[in-house]
Structure formats: C-alpha cells, structure tokens
C-alpha cells in the first residue's frame, strides 16, 4: 500500500543539501589529519607573532610554541607510542568492551531486552521502549543494533506498528548518551576527554564519571515524557499503513526459552553477589579499598568513582559468563576469550581514529594554543558581560549544528574540549556543566542526521516492514522528537545554570580556580 504521508518539500530540500554536504566531507580520520596540519600552521604563526597570555592559576606567562621547533619535532617522534596508548578514553573503551563482548555474544543483552519488553503493559509500551533504548546505549553500538530491530518485532507481536517501535527504540538510544537512568561507558569516555581539556588549565583536575547523573535523570524523564506524547499523538497516526509484511518465522524470537530464563536468573544472582562485594569493599571495617575514610567530605567516594571502569568490566564479564554457561553459548574458557576478541573487532576503525585524535590533543597542549585561546576568549567574554546562563545554550546549539558535519560525539568533543572547557572554567562554569551542555546538543541531531550511521541503519530496518519507506518519511517521523528535545534541553540547561543545581554526586555548576 502506498505511503500515506509525503515529505515536507522544505525539509526534503534541507535533507538533500545536508546529504550533499556530508558526501563531500572527508573521512573522520582525514578530518583530524587536516586539523593537525592547520594546528601546525597556526602554531608556527603564533610563535612568530609572539602570542602569549598569563596563566590565571600559576601566574606564569604562556607563549605559543611552534610545533615545527626542534624540541617539539623530537618529542613528536620519540613519544608517538606513548601519545597513542596514553590517550585517556582508549584504555577505558578497550577494558569495557572486553567485558561487554562476553555479555553480548553470550546472548545476555538480547535475552535481557526481550525479557523486559514482554513484561510491559500495552498502555506504557511507548515510554518503556524509549527507556530501554536509553539503557541499550550502555552496550555501545552492539546494544543498539540488537535492540532497534527487536523493538520492531515486539511491537508487531503486540499488534502495534513495528516501525513505531523501532523509531522509539532509536529515539531512546540516540538520546541515551545524555538522558539516562544510570551512567555508563559513554560517561567515562566523554569525561576522559573533558579531563584532558580541564588539565590544560588545572593539571590536578580529575574526572568524576557520575558528574552528570542528576542532570541526566532530568533530561531522561523529560525526553521520555515528550517522546511518549509525540509518539502516540503525532508519529503513530501518520506512519504508512502496515499490513503484516515482515512478520514471519522471526515472531517466535520474542519468546524466552527455558534455558534463557535460567540464564537470566543466574546472571541476576551474579549481579547481586557483585553488588554485595562492592558494598563490602566500601564498608568493611579496616579494609575499604573503594572508600577513603581519611579524605574530606565529598572526596571519600573518589576511589569508587575511579574504579567504575573495572567494576563495569567485571559486571559485563561475570554476568555474561553466568548466562552463557547456563544456555550453552559458553562451554569453556576459550569461548570467553573468543567473545572478547569478537567484541574488540568492531573497534578497529575507532582505534585508527584515536591514533590521530590523540596526537591532535597532545599537540594542541604542546603548542599552548589551547590555554591561550581559552584565557583570551574568557577575558573577552568577561568584558562583553555574557552571562553563563546564555553561554551554555549557545554551546548546546553549536554542538547540535556541528553534528551535521561530524557525526562522532567523541571526535567533536576531542576538538572542542581543549578550548571550551578551560575557557568556561575561567568564567566560573565547571567542566561537568560544560560537558552536560555539549552532550545535550550532540544527541539531538542524531535523530535526523544522515551522517549518523544509526539513522541510516534505522531506515534499513524500517524497510523490512514497509519496503516503500523513504528517507524523507523517516525524517518527518523523527523531526518532531528532535525539535521538542532541543527546546526542552535549552530550558533545562539554562534553568540548571540559573539555579546552580547539583549535576551529580559531588559536582555542581559553579567552579572556582585553585588559589595561586
């Protein structure tokens, strides 16, 4: 049956223009190579012109260094391996993916999502689908690839439009990087880059992976409520008619077998044991490696925060092992090793990208361009009198627009953080608040950007159920979510700054530079 909706002509022209622009952009690796070349040229020019600034914390004069100087060229070659392996997000990602690979390829993620979805009443199916999409982001791309088509199948089995299920699942997954119930891998990664930027100004600044948790909860509940209303009132009535196409033998895959249910029970038992062990390592008298009783208030949980990556690795590994052993996907230790290797395989493009991204970040630091640009930029903004309540919505909007040009959240933040984070620190805004504003903007255009691989995959998944569905139809369905989430994100961000609400455990909006 032909589609009952037609793409808006203006939106269609805009999308085609973005596609043409996106097709002309080089690969993200090439973008970083170009940026490194530009950085070298600017450093040479800045050193020749004598650009400098006084460091607001130490009082020392910072001068731009030419990246072609004998000292820095020697450093570039001698420290290349250390630059790559020492890049903060790299080790975090590798460790977590080793554990997540076992949980994914052992079947735990798929079974857990199916168990959760089949217990949901039809009346709250939409908000729960969005919520589970948010949680699926913690399994990285693997969770999204499993969950989005699975949501379509589960909606079809309940008599609802399968495309609606997949759109809602994708909406949750695409925005789950900022709005979520619990922090996860992305929080560790994004704050690793934030730490790199903050340490250009204050070398002792350390990240808190839970630094946006309360803010994330507010965004999550806002997006779930708005998504529920938009999905039910605007999107579902306008979707192309579905006549049962695509619902075949796969319908049974929504059911859990007896072995899968047994596996989930064992994984749940392991989860409880891990939680108990973690609490014990924080509260055992005389032996609490995850809690520093001698530290001042607000810093006592720092050992726990610093151990989150290791704890998440153990969580994924042991629950995945327990589940896989119960269902038969894991019969020996070699199976676990093989699953870890499979988990790492999709990271190969990321490992290549990080090689160039790490060099861009460290060379930015060597040149002193980052702190000098931040110091001078902060001074100019202070003279103009721009209020923080306006600065962060501007950053949010810029982040959203940049997503049409560079799809990777990590790539954009790697380029922006060395300037934006220290600049706003000098204006009294914490790195955690700056990170939160960036994250809100970054996730919005994931819903409608053809440069985002997830958006393209969503269209392919939808065409299984509606073969004639086109890009413009999907854009028309996703656009109301993006607009509503953008407006809500602006309001929440501005309100958070104005009221100076806590962002997470031990973090807030204001920031004061250390005394000299």
Residue ranges and their predicted role:
Residues 72, 82-90, 117-128, 162-164, ...:
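Membrane-interfacial loop-to-helix junctions in multi-pass transporters
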Residues 9, 13-14, 52-90, 200-208, ...:
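Interfacial loop/helix-cap signal at membrane boundaries in integral membrane proteins
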Residues 93-94, 121-152, 157, 351-358, ...:
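Hydrophobic alpha-helical transmembrane segments of multi-pass integral membrane proteins
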Residues 28-33, 37, 41, 62-110, ...:
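Core transmembrane alpha-helical segments of multi-pass membrane transporters/permeases
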Residues 1-24, 53-68, 236-263, 509-516:
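Intrinsically disordered, low-complexity non-transmembrane regions of multi-pass membrane transporters
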Residues 44-71, 186-190, 286-296, 367-376, ...:
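Interfacial/capping segments of alpha-helical transmembrane domains
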Residues 19, 23, 148, 152-243, ...:
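Membrane-core helix-loop-helix motifs of multi-pass transport proteins
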Residues 32-47, 93-101, 132-136, 172-176, ...:
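Hydrophobic core segments of alpha-helical transmembrane domains in multi-pass membrane transport
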